[in-house]
Design a protein with these regions (language model features):
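Conserved GHKL (Bergerat-fold) ATPase module
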Residues: 1-285
Length: 285
């Protein structure tokens, strides 16, 4: 029988990997496996894989979905645009449903409301799995983010209904340290009196990190997000705030830093630990 029709407990990791490589024409091991059966409005089974390496054509506008659609284990299409949202186009695998018609044309399938329900169900499941992974294995999630974060951020523009879920997954470089931070991490480190999430966006990560615009913020030890993905300038037009704090560019208008608490410095303070140069940190990532 088809591997996805079997119970997950009866499938070994090696069998999953073998199927992933065969179905995806890939050579890596999957970074994460999502095998899910949904019984409800539209019954369907999905066996999806997040690759451990980014495909060369990830940012190709013409890139087709690598998730195959089956109806009752009969292959229907591997180019169904409305099965997986564009911002999850890194997914590989299959979706099988007994509730779609075998006789419908591919064109008719695109407008089938049942397909839209399957798409929503899968999207929520995948975002939920990524959230769990980010909590349980933050270092592994960093690997995922390095490969696919720039694509996932497209969901902030494409999918307003799930924007908050996508935003929770987003990770950013900042002036705080050389790792990646979530927006919740940033909020937790905000200084007393800090009313905004400060960021600087540009095309070159190293140039951003060396910008003189950062000097006033460094002097007050106020964290600034450093955004260098092409998609960043676009999603910031759609996302205005997070947890009540607005996003504010440090290069547009003068930032009022007077109301933000000064660092209390004394000889025993941890704040006296020398802060590593931000440009060096960016270069090391």
């Amino acid at each position: 029988s088809a591997i996805w029709a079997r119970a997950p407990k009866d499938i070994t990791e090696e069998q999953y990997t073998e199927f992933y490589r065969h179905a995806s024409h890939a050579f890596d091991k999957p970074w994460h496996i999502i095998h899910n059966r949904v019984e409800g409005t539209v019954n369907h089974t999905s066996l999806l894989f997040v690759p451990s390496a980014a495909p060369f054509d990830l940012f190709d506008a013409e890139r087709k979905s690598h998730v195959k659609l089956y109806v009752n284990r009969v292959f229907i299409s591997d180019t169904t645009k409305d099965l997986i949202p564009s911002y999850l186009r890194f997914l590989r695998g299959i979706v099988d449903s007994q509730d779609l018609s075998l006789n419908v044309s591919r064109e008719m399938l695109q407008t089938d409301p049942k397909l839209a329900k399957i798409k929503t169900s899968i999207t929520k499941k995948v975002l939920g799995e990524l959230k769990k992974k980010s909590n349980k294995a933050p270092e592994e999630f960093t690997e995922f983010w390095t490969n696919f974060g720039a694509v996932l951020k497209e969901g902030l523009i494409e999918d307003p209904s799930l924007r908050d879920r996508v935003l929770e997954l987003c990770r950013f470089t900042s002036t705080h340290n050389q790792g990646l931070s979530s927006l919740s991490d940033y909020i937790g480190r905000c200084k007393e009196g800090q009313e905004a999430i400060y960021y600087m966006a540009g095309e070159d990560a190293t140039k951003i990190a060396q910008s003189p615009h950062l000097e006033g913020f460094k002097a007050k030890n106020i964290e600034v997000l450093l955004l260098s993905d092409p998609v960043d300038e676009f999603w910031l037009q759609h996302v205005t705030e997070f947890e009540g704090k607005p996003f504010k560019s440090i290069t547009r208008g003068a930032a009022d830093l007077d109301n933000i608490a000064e660092e209390k410095k004394d000889e025993n303070s941890k704040e006296n630990v020398e802060t590593p140069d931000i440009a060096d940190l960016i270069a090391s990532i």
